[in-house]
Amino acid sequence: MRILLTNDDGIHAEGLSVLERIARTITDDVWVVAPEVDQSGLAHSLTLSEPLRLRPVSERRFALRGTPTDCVIMAVKKILDRKPDLVLSGVNIGANLADDVTYSGTVAGAIEGTLQGIRSMALSQAYHYAVGREVPWDVAETHAPALIRTLMDVDLPDGTLVNLNFPNCAVDSVAGVEVTSQGKLDFGLSIDERTDGRGFPYFWLRFGERAGDFRSGTDIRALRDNKISVTPLKLDMTDHAVQDLIARALRKGTVA
């Protein structure tokens, strides 16, 4: 079994080392193609305005000056002599939940793997950001191997990937695994305006107080309850339930 690893935090990220250890409990045929630098928040973007620079790091490990999407394409189209059986993207530092999956480079790595016809999973470790606070990587490292093996035996339809989020707690405090849907989360984004040394303004995006819908069955509720969240995601973003509604409205109107 061949596994391809990528992430959005970069080739030197601790979460990628965790993912390598997870993958090696499943197979010895592990390949890594990860961004040269942090690509967090770039979602499913391609690099089209500059060249992709590929750097061998060590045996079966490569750094690419590009996005997670670029990394998966480079691995499948250039580096590997055959497609991997599984793409794992992560382990991200911080959860990728609810609306956040649309921004996530970690989830995008799994999206691209799915587009390439490969079983793909995104893995993220929840973490409350604070100086000096440890990331509980051991939660993902302990629970992911068995979970991945189980999910590999599931006959998923084409165009479906799996988003895994591990709770921010001690290993022995994990309250189980729950199959979830995407929740709703407001990140409280605002614009932080500053002034440089020449008096010109510049800006940062700032995260504020997060407000979420913690209804039972959602990914954000599962993590709040110290459960591992397993969310199947589809590439087909068509809102099938609304198609007939729009079609009826158009038939009543003047659209040709």
UniProtKB/Swiss-Prot annotation:
Transmembrane segments: none annotated. Its cofactor is a divalent metal cation. It is found in: Cytoplasm. It comes from Sinorhizobium medicae (strain WSM419). Nucleotidase that shows phosphatase activity on nucleoside 5'-monophosphates. The gene is surE. It is an enzyme of class 3 (hydrolase). It catalyses: a ribonucleoside 5'-phosphate + H2O = a ribonucleoside + phosphate. This is 5'-nucleotidase SurE. Its EC number is 3.1.3.5. A divalent metal cation binds at D8, D9, S40, N92. Keywords: Cytoplasm, Hydrolase, Metal-binding, Nucleotide-binding. Belongs to the SurE nucleotidase family. Binds 1 divalent metal cation per subunit.
